[in-house]
Structure formats: structure tokens, C-alpha cells
UniProtKB/Swiss-Prot annotation:
Keywords: Chloroplast, mRNA processing, Plastid, RNA-binding, tRNA processing. Usually encoded in the trnK tRNA gene intron. Probably assists in splicing its own and other chloroplast group II introns. InterPro entries: Domain_X, Maturase_MatK, Maturase_MatK_N. It comes from Chaetosphaeridium globosum. This is Maturase K.
Amino acid sequence: MERNKNYYINVFHKQAENDLNFNKFYFYFFQETFYCLAYKQVSYKFLQNNVFIKKKKKFSFFNLKRTIRSMRNQNYKESFFFIEQKKLSKKLLFSKLFYELLQEILKCILEISFKIKKNPKISSYSTMSSIHGPFISFEENLIYFPVAIQSYLPNRVHPELIVRILRSYNLDVNLFHFLRNIVHNGLYILSPPFLLNFGFRSLSTIFFNIYAYEIDLGFLSFLKLQKDLPQKYQTELDIFSSSRKITFYFKNYSDFNNLKKIDQIERKYNNIIDYGPIYYLRYSNILLISLNLIKKNANFFQLIYIRFFHLRFHFLFAKNLVKKISFNQDQIFFLGFLVFFFYTKIQIRIKLKKCLVNFIKLEKKICINVPIKLLIIFLSKNGFCDISGNSKSKLSWSVLQDIEIIEKFRRLWLTISGYYSGSSNKYCLKIVLYILRYSCAKTLACKHKMSLKKIWKKYTLNLSVTLKFQTGKKKFLSFSHFKDFHKDEKSWQLNLKETNSIVYTFWN
């Protein structure tokens, strides 16, 4: 009888409540019911492209048991670890299928172990499933922060770092060494969510989420300890030794004996003690920390940030990779938007008994715009237009049917217009609409070898096309749709969780 994944999750939870040192995941790794669940979730395209499996039309679990037996005997040459070193053969095709199956099983086990582990260190850790979630928090919180630090988490990480993070989870020794072999033999590039995947697809995203969650908890707990440090620092009897500890943690060892630099760091550290709240925001591998500090103290906080990640996670950040941004002067390019602040003057008139007094109040507001020039350059790289904005025919799509060509252009426009629905200059998207509309017409003209006039007559000015099995006409890019889009107020879509790969490569 087949069992669902939720059944095993409940079993693991009950055993973990009874036994605190519960770590028997490797025993369930060799059960056949897990392989049945994994076989259902293997993509159909993978099986469809495999010619050798098409002939058999069925998959026998005897071959699966042979791989498990070879894994127990540690004959890794016959298993899926050394796929890249082999040539294409029947064993290679089966080894890829085994890899897909075993990968799904590891996904289930790591997901269950991650749910069982409860980390009560930070209760205010909140996740935003929507892409537009950070911009709502921008409008509410970032107005009060003058300085920010922006950086990118590296995708290329040493595999032993992931092994050390996995060691903290409740994993038994056998499963831990099995994961260690997988990480050291194949996983060199982590793929964050919504990123184009390289190498291991699903396991890489799981490892990246665990790795990013560990970074968040480590850095936020470090900031909480830093707030409690001033009281310990003032009550310390030997102030010179405590300043030496600070310099040893935040400065290089060569500068340790320089007493003048110790005094300078001590003064800077006393100034940085009085900072207010810190706003920490991370989306996939993009990290933004906004501070309520002066520029001089922000420079010191930048050194703290670099030094912390170097000692805790062995990252070698350069100073140009960790940017210091002042909201009053600079613009931030964050997730495909240009974010900057401006001041508006509000005149206030107060009526007194004998006269009227006029006051001018400066109100700080946030502006989130569409980078229209960067969008045109990006569309030119993908073959939709020139650098100047003149539309071209998409030759790679001219092989498709007419309905598929129009649908692809329509979906691209809907993703761009939906993604930038919360921007303040939505009217600039009319240029993108014009480029996509004429490039669609030119691809149809290139396919049928016709002039543009005949295509406008055939598909009408709105490029509407009648679809089979549907009533009415389906409009693609009409200016009436754009007028309704422009009349709408600025709105963020909290349902937006994924974007088109073309749009993602633009804002990443």
C-alpha cells in the first residue's frame, strides 16, 4: 500500500517528541515506499527524452535495488556519483534516472529534518513569499534610514561549509557521510530560488535555503549581542584589554600592536554604540541592511560586516562588492527597480490673532521607478529591438505557429506590466509595449514573407486572433488595455512568487 509524504512527516514528528536525540533518517532512506513517491515526482520530460527507457516503457525496481546494494558496498563507480566522468551508455541513462530518484528522497528527508529542528533564537524572523513584499517594507520603514549596505551572497562556496552547516541538524552518521559525498563530488554552484539552475537542480536550492537561513540567524544574533555589549564594555575593569579584544576581532593581526589605532577604534566603537534600529532584508542572494547612522560610523559598520562574514563563513568580500549607499544622494538598483528618495515642500499657514505665519515643512518620500533605458538595452540583447529602441523580428520564434508566437509575446508583456505595476512611472512602459507589438508583427511577416500592411489587415490593429475551442477573440497588445493599465493606481502584487526567466535575468 502506497503512503504519502505527510504520513512519514507525522511519524518523524511523533518519534522526535518522544526521543530528543532522534536521528534515524538513514533507515528510512532505503525503504521502497520512498522510491515510489520519488518516482511519481520525477519529471515526465526526463523520461520522455530518454530513448532507452521509451522502449521498455516501464521501470523495474530490481535495478534500483542493485544501486542500493552497490551503495552499501561503496562501489561508487557504479552509482551516480561519477556520472560526468563516464561516456554515454545504457548505464549512464539509468544512473541519471537513479540520481533523479535519490535526489527526490533526499529532498523529503532534508525537508522533514528542517521542520523538526526548531530554532528559538530569533522570534522576529519573518519570510516574504512575494517578490513585491520588500517594496512594501521599503515604503513603510526605509524612509527613516539614511544609510544602507548592499551586498550579494556568493553562489560559489566551498562544499565543506555546507557540510558544517548540515552537521548542526539531527542527522545520523551514515546519512551525513552520504550527503558529504554528494556535496564534494558535484555541488559547487548553489542556485538560489528564481535563479537559473546549474548542475544539481532541487538539491542545490535546498542547500542554498539552509545556507542562507544560517547566515540570517547568525548575523541577526550577532547584532543582538552587539546591542548588549556596551553594558559589559563599560563595566569592564580593564578597559585596555577589552579594547584589545575588539581590535583582535575587527582588525588584522598586523595592526594589533599599534596603540594609536586601538584608541581610534575605541572612539569609533563608542560612537557606533548609540545606533538605532537596523533593518535587515534579504531576497534570494541579494542582501540589504539599512542603518540609522552617520557616514563615518557606516564605514566602520561596513568593516564589521566584512570581518564577520570572513570569520564566520570564510567569505573574502572586497570593499567594492559591499556597497555603502546613502539614500539622500544615491539610487539603489534593487530587484529591477530604481529606488531613491526625494523631499517635497508642504506649506503650512498658521492663523494668529494679528497676523498669518507661513511655514515650509519638508516631507521625505520614496520613489520606485522603472529603469526604462536598461529595459530597452536588455530587450536589444534578447533580439527584440536595437539599442536605439527600433523593433526587430524574433527569428528563433518564427518557426512556431501564429497562435504560439502571439501567446509568447502576450505573456512577456503581461509579466513585465504585472511586475512593474507598483512603479510610479508606469507610463514609460508604453515604449516596451510598442517594441513588443511591432516585433510580434515583424516575426509574423518574416514567417509568412508578407508586408506589415497585410499582417495588420489579417490580424487587425490590436493583433487579435480567433482561437479554436474558444468563443470570441483574444486580444494581444491593444492600446485600450494599456489605457486601463495606466488608469489603475500604484499596486503591489502579493500573489507574485515567480517571474519569467527573461525578466529574472534582467533584474539579477
